[in-house]
Amino acid sequence: MTPELLTTLLITGGGLIALAVFFTFVPVGLWISSFAAGVHVSIFTLIGMRLRRVIPSKIVNPLIKAVKAGIELNTNQLESHFLAGGNVDRVVNALIAAHRANIELSFERAAAIDLAGRNVLEAVQMSVNPKVIETPFIAGVAMDGIEVKAKARITVRANIDRLVGGAGEETIIARVGEGVVSTIGSQNNHKHVLENPDMISRTVLTKGLDSGTAFEILSIDIADIDIGKNIGAVLQTDQAEADKKIAQAKAEERRAMAIAREQEMKSSVEEMRAKVVGAEAEVPLAMAEALRNGKLGVMDYVNYLNVQADTEMRKAIGAPVDSESDNE
């Protein structure tokens, strides 16, 4: 192989390697696409994106869509949003959808909403096509004690101006539930609620429940209504059971006091009997003393014994007869 041929091969190989590195590092195809679409992005801008570790296709392709839709944007805006961690493609799609629907939405506002964690494209779509939120069954108790369960469907539209810092769907559902419960609870009879379910939606809708939220409530419709438990009867039953237990406790207390009083009286009776026995034991001593002193004669003593014997006989006659002895 001659030196001239070797040199030619080296130059050709080096050129091919240089071209491969160039086309790998510089997105020439993307630059041609942007130029053909009428979006003027220089090669040096694309190289700068590579150096800043920005994927050029993530910037140029959304920029082409925006320019074709009639929205004026530049690479600096999209690149800064990309470096901030935002979704450039979703923001551009949201701007295009808002532009088509005649909704005023700037790039700065859309980028702020996207960086706040909200889906700005879904918000724009919800502004055009309202969303229906269905609540679970909400239970309220009318003044007559009957539980009424209602299910509501809330039609909401996204409020783009309040997407950042506004409350979400959970707050809307909670506020509507509170309004339904208060409306049912203010009715004297549950039948009035069953006859006029639209009264609930009208009352709740006038409360301004969408304040401070990211949505605008368009309508509240009662989808289903049903009767639950008789809460008043349950409460009365529970109260009666509690009163019964209280009365039983008081009766038991009185019974215990009566038993204690009975035992006290028995003790008093035994004490009195002991005193009587003691007094009876002193009678013979007193009689003996009276006989010694001459204050009691012999005949008086004999009469006393006769009276005592007569008393014992009357007691024996008045005593009940044993049935077993009668049978014998």
Curated annotation (Swiss-Prot):
<comment type="subunit">
    <text>Homooligomerizes.</text>
</comment>
<dbReference type="GO" id="GO:0045121">
    <property type="term" value="C:membrane raft"/>
</dbReference>
<keyword id="KW-1133">Transmembrane helix</keyword>
<keyword id="KW-1003">Cell membrane</keyword>
<feature type="transmembrane region" description="Helical">
    <location>
        <begin position="30"/>
        <end position="50"/>
    </location>
</feature>
<dbReference type="Pfam" id="PF12127">
    <property type="entry name" value="FloA"/>
</dbReference>
<comment type="similarity">
    <text>Belongs to the flotillin-like FloA family.</text>
</comment>
<protein>
    <recommendedName>
        <fullName>Flotillin-like protein FloA</fullName>
    </recommendedName>
</protein>
<comment type="function">
    <text>Found in functional membrane microdomains (FMM) that may be equivalent to eukaryotic membrane rafts. FMMs are highly dynamic and increase in number as cells age. Flotillins are thought to be important factors in membrane fluidity.</text>
</comment>
<dbReference type="InterPro" id="IPR022853">
    <property type="entry name" value="FloA"/>
</dbReference>
<keyword id="KW-0812">Transmembrane</keyword>
<feature type="transmembrane region" description="Helical">
    <location>
        <begin position="9"/>
        <end position="29"/>
    </location>
</feature>
<keyword id="KW-0472">Membrane</keyword>
<dbReference type="GO" id="GO:0005886">
    <property type="term" value="C:plasma membrane"/>
</dbReference>
